[in-house]
Amino acid sequence: MVITDDEPAGRASIRALLAGDARLEVVEECTTGPETVRAIRDHHPDLLFLDVQLPGQSGIAALTEVAEEIRPVVIFVTAYDAHALRAFDFEAADYLLKP
């Protein structure tokens, strides 16, 4: 799986949430949209935790860039309810609300 969040605490929280499941392996952590696009193309992850708001290119824009090539299961991470609801327009499997 790939975890993308521009905040170190956000990435750490996701890792901690999933730490007990040996079936899940984090292959890369990203902080920007372009890093995420490269990681998806390099690793073809089955699962992607993706922050909606990233500096520069948004998480949604990054996902749109690779959508025709690779379709990981996506769980959007956001601090805003409106973004969470919009995530389902992009076929998100689920979302996590940041505190």
Residue ranges and their predicted role:
Residues 1-9, 14, 18:
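Conserved acidic segment of CheY-like receiver
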Residues 8, 31-35:
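Acidic phosphotransfer microenvironment of two-component signaling modules
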Residues 4-5, 30, 48:
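Conserved sequence signature across two-component system core domains
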Residues 38-99:
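CheY-like receiver
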Residues 23-31, 39:
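Short hydrophobic/Thr-rich beta-strand motif most characteristic of the beta2 strand and flanking loop
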Residues 19-23, 69-70:
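Short helix-capping segments at alpha-helix termini
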Residues 2, 25-28, 94:
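Structural signal for short hydrophobic segments within the conserved structured cores
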